[in-house]
Each structure stands twice: as C-alpha cells, then as structure tokens.
C-alpha cells in the first residue's frame, strides 16, 4: 500500500543516490530524537493538498529507501470520489508519462484507471494518492505514498508531523489528534505548512496563527512547533525547480530540521521569527487574490501589477508592525514568497477567475482541482481584527484616531468584494488608482517610525511575542 518497492528507484531518479550523505543526515536526526536501533523515525503528513502531498513525497524520495530507519506516511480523509472528468484527465496524464505507465503496470494498478476512464469504476482520492496522484495536482505525478485514512492510526506514534491542512481545518483536526496524544510521554515535532490566521475578538482582539492553534489543541509546547514557508509552487518543487524556504521557530529544532530537509534543489534556511513568517504567509494569500484580479482586469499590464505590488506590500509591512516591535523585513525569501504567490499561486488564480467571471463567490472557496482558497477566510480575519477601535492608530492627514484597517485601502476593498459582496471585482482598480492616495513609502515610514506595536494582538504581554 505504500511505495517501498519503488523507493530506491525514486531516490536515484531524484538525485539522492549518494546514500552515505542522506543516511548521515537521517542518523543525526534520529540521535537527537533518541531513536533506538530498529525503531524507525516516523514522519506523518496530515492533510493531502498539493503542498502537503509534495512535501511527503520529497521525504519519501529522499529517505524512503532507508526503510529500516524511517517511515513516511500521509493521512487524508476517506471517501472523496474522483469525478468522471478528472478520471479521464488522469488517464491522459498516465499515458503521457512512460515512467508512470510502467510503474502502474508493474504494480498491477493500471487497469483501475482504464475502468475509471470508461466510467466503469469510481476512483477515490486516497487510492490514487497511494499511486502518487494528488487530487489537487493531477498533472504532476508523485512517487507512491503510504496513505492512511484513520487519523488515530496515522498519528499516534508519529515523531514528526507535517501539517498540510488549510488553516481553516487545522484547529478541528489537531483537536482530534490531541485526544490521541493524551498518554504520550514525549511530545512530537510538528512542522506546519499552513498559511492563514484566525481572529478572536473576545475578550480582546487578537490573532491566532496555525502554530498557536496546534499548541492550544494538542498541548504540544510551542518550542516543538515550527513553520516552513518560502517562494514555493508545489508542482515546480517536485519537478526539481530550484527553490528555497525558511523553517521558523525555537532554536531547539529548527537548525537540525533545516539540515534534514535540505536537498540539492530545495535549500532550507532557519530563522527565529516565527510570527512574522506565519502572518506574512496569511497576508500574501489575501493580497494574491487582488493581484489576480488586477492582472485579469488590466490584460496582464506589468505597470498596473507593479503599482498593486508596491501598495499591497506596504500594507503588509504596516500590519506586521502592529504585531511585532521589530518584525523581519519584507526582503529575501519573505519578499520572494509574496512575489511568487501574487504571480502564480492558487489565490491569484482564484482572483483572475473571479474577475473574468469564470468563477463566482457563490461557488465557495473550496475549488475542484485546487483545494481551499485560504486567502478568502484570511481577508475576513484580518479585516475583523484591524477594524477594532481599541487598536486605533493616528491617521497622518486627518490627525485623528482611526482603526488600523483605515490605513489599508486594498484590504478594505477586498473585504467589500469577497466578504460583504458589496462591490464587483473591478472595484479593486479604484483602490489602486485613488488620486488622494499617498506614496506607499509613507505608510512604511509610519509603520517604522511610530509605536504601532500592539502586544495584545498576540495574546501575550510585551516582550514575549517572539517564539
């Protein structure tokens, strides 16, 4: 059911034939985790969206041939049927790739895809994932994966858990996981890929990030929970496009994990600023929807997209200064992550489709073949949070106190378009063409030159904001 028999071939095909170096990295992490001989390191993905599936496939490709020392498995919910049109497209993908075709024939798995193509059989998302096909990314075949549909079975003995869930599902699923971990003596390491936030307004306005949701739901200390983000498009990463990422969190685990995750085509650096990276991970999805709208409405005008980029990044910088005294600068991988998401991510795609009329808001934010559009819920969360009068800031021109959201006109426009549905998508252009708007540099200078920091937004006293 896993992909163990294919692992040596996958390792060689993906440039990891040098077993000594790979095995040394694995042995080093096993020692740090206190793993005894004969007790494999258990890496478990929770959630099988595009990035979560690719991440587990990268681990399987790199380390799966060392099956006595490591096990990689992934959990996804059972029962999700593959529709006929997707089954037909999947069959085309299989037949276009000789290596995939031969693999399925060798595993006696090809016939079911013929039957699915003909409509004689219903395929399910968990069974095709076992063969290396992620429902949200059919065009990019992965290596075979060991798929578990029982959550308790998947996670109860995990050493490292990869959170590949949307932020909107993280609290619920990890709440269930927390019940299975009540008897655990040692806490696992959790690496979150989720990008999004929740807003809590009672008793005070505050932001809740996915790592905080996980800690609250499971009781796992924050020093064992990390975030990984970067300028990464899942399909391109698996196709060996050169990429980099940052793993963020406490000192204890981020450096060893950065070394363990690093591959020739996927460079992982470490950084202590968990909060800024998680918040930016949510913010970039917010503004990516607007970027897609602008691209579609202006016929891909480079000038208009650049204007939007300057304005939205200034709002992002402004918002992060409310959350931290000295946030990580929007530069390097943080800036690149924002850039690639505005350029090509699923949230930008969603904005384009809305602006072209090919999707409607009534269709919801879970789109077939794409998964959850996390920017929609993030727009609502950030707007609700920043519209609270108790967080008021001084308006530089009106010389009066206003809610922070008044300093973020693009966020306001996206809220009225996506959440309130008061304005059509083309109103995003008015938000970037307002003649009374000041230079985005002024917003950045306001953020950096004034005491915007509100420690209560993170639900903790001043000085304790950083992980």
From Swiss-Prot:
One of its GO terms (cellular component) is cytosol. Substrate binds at residues 195, 346-347. InterPro entries: 6-PGluconate_DH-like_C_sf (IPR008927), 6PGD_dom2 (IPR013328), G3P_DH_NAD-dep (IPR006168), G3P_DH_NAD-dep_C (IPR006109), G3P_DH_NAD-dep_N (IPR011128), NAD(P)-bd_dom_sf (IPR036291). Signal peptide: none annotated. It is found in: Cytoplasm, Cytosol. Gene3D superfamilies: N-(1-d-carboxylethyl)-l-norvaline Dehydrogenase, domain 2 (1.10.1040.10), NAD(P)-binding Rossmann-like Domain (3.40.50.720). The keyword Cytoplasm applies. Pfam families: NAD_Gly3P_dh_C, NAD_Gly3P_dh_N. Keywords: Cytoplasm, NAD, Oxidoreductase. The active site is at residue 284. Its EC number is 1.1.1.8. It catalyses: sn-glycerol 3-phosphate + NAD(+) = dihydroxyacetone phosphate + NADH + H(+). Its main location: cytoplasm. GO terms for biological process: carbohydrate metabolic process; glycerol-3-phosphate catabolic process; glycerol-3-phosphate metabolic process. NAD(+) binds at residues 47-52, 195, 234, 346, 374. GO terms for molecular function: glycerol-3-phosphate dehydrogenase (NAD+) activity; NAD binding. It comes from the Eukaryota. Belongs to the NAD-dependent glycerol-3-phosphate dehydrogenase family. May be involved in cell redox homeostasis. PANTHER family: GLYCEROL-3-PHOSPHATE DEHYDROGENASE, GLYCEROL-3-PHOSPHATE DEHYDROGENASE [NAD(+)] 2, CYTOSOLIC-RELATED. This is Probable glycerol-3-phosphate dehydrogenase [NAD(+)] 2, cytosolic. It comes from Oryza sativa subsp. japonica.
